[in-house]
């Protein structure tokens, strides 16, 4: 059950891509190449951790085969740049600032999810959808990357009044184009 106690879903916002990032100078080219490597699966109890764990499991990569660490995006990016970790997962809208900044420090490669794993993921939950990160989204990324996407959802506390929630959604949707432009996200 994905429901969060004390909150309710207000609106679907945009699709977040599960981005799997490695250094371009590494020998990691597929998910299977993560075996024996240290991988940031996102902050503890985050959506990124959930997605990363599911992807690795369905690829046959358990915690016995991959050293999984919980790091927030900034820490993971710093450790990938310095070579302290081998890969990071980041579930966010494409053109993610932390990945763009990391690409200025070192050359990167994004990993695609293979068809077999992708089919398993899509069969696992209706929240996942196939997502293509277009070529040239990030510096040095010269080909499309196949991954999964999940819808970002705006949650509101059950304590918020109906009027406040209505005003929030009215403001959000009346400025949806501005939001999409300002954040480089697909609306």
Language-model features: locations:
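Short amphipathic alpha-helical coupling segments at ligand-binding clamshell hinges
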Residues: 161-171
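Pocket-lining segment of extracytoplasmic ligand-binding domains
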Residues: 26, 62-155, 160-161
């Amino acid at each position: 059950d994905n429901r969060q106690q004390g909150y309710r879903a207000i609106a679907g916002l945009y699709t977040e891509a599960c981005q799997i990032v490695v250094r371009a100078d590494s020998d990691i080219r597929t998910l299977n190449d993560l075996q024996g490597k240290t991988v940031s699966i996102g902050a503890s109890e985050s959506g990124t951790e959930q997605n990363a764990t599911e992807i690795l499991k369905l690829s046959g990569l358990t915690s016995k085969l991959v050293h999984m660490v919980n790091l927030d995006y900034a820490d993971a990016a710093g450790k990938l740049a310095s070579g302290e970790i081998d890969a990071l997962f980041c579930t966010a809208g494409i053109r993610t600032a932390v990945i763009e900044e990391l690409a200025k420090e070192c050359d990167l490669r994004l990993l695609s999810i293979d068809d077999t794993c992708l089919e398993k993921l899509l069969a696992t939950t209706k929240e996942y959808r196939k997502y293509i990160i277009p070529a040239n989204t990030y510096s040095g990324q010269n080909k499309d990357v196949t991954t999964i996407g999940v819808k970002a959802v705006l949650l509101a506390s059950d304590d918020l009044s109906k009027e406040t929630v209505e005003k929030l959604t009215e403001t959000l949707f009346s400025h949806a184009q501005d939001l999409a432009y300002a954040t480089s996200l697909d609306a």
